Amino acid sequence: MGGNHSHKPPVFDENEEVNFDHFQILRAIGKGSFGKVCIVQKRDTKKMYAMKYMNKQKCVERDEVRNVFRELQIMQGLEHPFLVNLWYSFQDEEDMFMVVDLLLGGDLRYHLQQNVHFTEGTVKLYICELALALEYLQRYHIIHRDIKPDNILLDEHGHVHITDFNIATVLKGSEKASSMAGTKPYMAPEVFQVYVDGGPGYSYPVDWWSLGVTAYELLRGWRPYEIHSATPIDEILNMFKVERVHYSSTWCEGMVSLLKKLLTKDPESRLSSLRDIQSMTYLADMNWDAVFEKALMPGFVPNKGRLNCDPTFELEEMILESKPLHKKKKRLAKHRSRDSTKDSCPLNGHLQQCLETVRKEFIIFNREKLRRQQGHNGQLSDLDGRIGSQTSSKLQDGRNNNILTHTCPRGCSS
């Protein structure tokens, strides 16, 4: 009785901004550097996505707002087969939300921990796919600065996708980046050098060094240098000076040559463009159009019968999370009712001011709507202009000069 109506997808006004109610929460699957991630289904289209959500108050208290805004500003101008693409961004009183491509194959770190053996053929294809993504980012003046197995997700067929742009930076013209950012074991020598003596700065080659470290680790199970998060910088720089990278005698000559050129300490001599990669004899037989079209099948395909992530994330969300997502609707209704009776506990003035600024400055994005407006051609026709005028002007070496600085003088987002 009435069953027919229950199966009809809800109809949302095309002009209405996408919000939390437009999605059904299915399960928690992970934690990023600035938030948690769950699988969601859009109620009207039934399409599945990953939804990252970040608590506003925690972001303000931890000085993370700028990084969240940076990631949003960069991702709204990008779309590529080997990136995790942004579809929607919106907010409510508690959280900021980013809805992105759902990739259920897990990240490469997870598979390394599961002792997956990656063949040379598989890693060769990964390098090619990631090279296409890095070339695309470089075209729009973006350095990712955190390429590593943790930030490379697999789709169900085993193709790679770069995620996590919260420490990425946009360069203007021929300028170089000058702040130390990244994950130590994957950071290029010139990034550490900038920290020690100012140096000349660094540019796009740092991402290609990180690609080399990642490829080496996938093949061997450990990294070319014994660097950890606690390793002192002077010790790291000394390692680069005196230690030689050891390449397995079982690897083919072409792979060793490719890795050596990616792990060249001098950024001027390092492989750091798609043209450089394509010039390698080892990759002469590669059909690059087929790579771009995902027509070449990777040697490793994730297990479709299991969720390729740590199952404890779901337990944490259900049991340990003080503000679980599945109870949000009821919780917000209760807060709104309490606010209307003036019976709520006010936050301290400075925090309240920061949260209000976050609300005003938050970037709302809807790729589905954008595509409709552009005639369903699937192309972001104004991509170059939007990246150039909006993102580059605001993001200079990771410093977003326009976000929160005018109303939060005590640095809640620095």
From Swiss-Prot:
Binding residues for ATP: 29-37, 52
Bias (Polar residues): 388-400
UniProt keyword annotation of ATP-binding present: yes
Protein's name in the database: Serine/threonine-protein kinase 32B
Family matches, as SUPFAM superfamilies: Protein kinase-like (PK-like)
Cofactor(s) named in the record: Mg(2+)
Family membership noted in the UniProt record: Belongs to the protein kinase superfamily. Ser/Thr protein kinase family.
Organismal lineage: Eukaryota, Metazoa, Chordata, Craniata, Vertebrata
Active site (record annotation): 146 (proton acceptor)
Pfam families, A to Z: Pkinase (PF00069)
EC number annotated for this UniProt entry: 2.7.11.1
Residue numbers spanned by region Disordered: 374-400
PROSITE patterns: PROTEIN_KINASE_ATP, PROTEIN_KINASE_DOM, PROTEIN_KINASE_ST
Keywords, alphabetical: ATP-binding, Kinase, Magnesium, Metal-binding, Nucleotide-binding, Serine/threonine-protein kinase, Transferase
Reactions accelerated catalytically: L-seryl-[protein] + ATP = O-phospho-L-seryl-[protein] + ADP + H(+); L-threonyl-[protein] + ATP = O-phospho-L-threonyl-[protein] + ADP + H(+)
Record GO terms (molecular function): ATP binding; metal ion binding; protein serine kinase activity; protein serine/threonine kinase activity
Keyword Transferase: yes
Domain Protein kinase: 23-283
Alphabetical list of PANTHER family matching this protein: G PROTEIN-COUPLED RECEPTOR KINASE/RIBOSOMAL PROTEIN S6 KINASE (PTHR24355), SERINE_THREONINE KINASE 32B (PTHR24355:SF33)
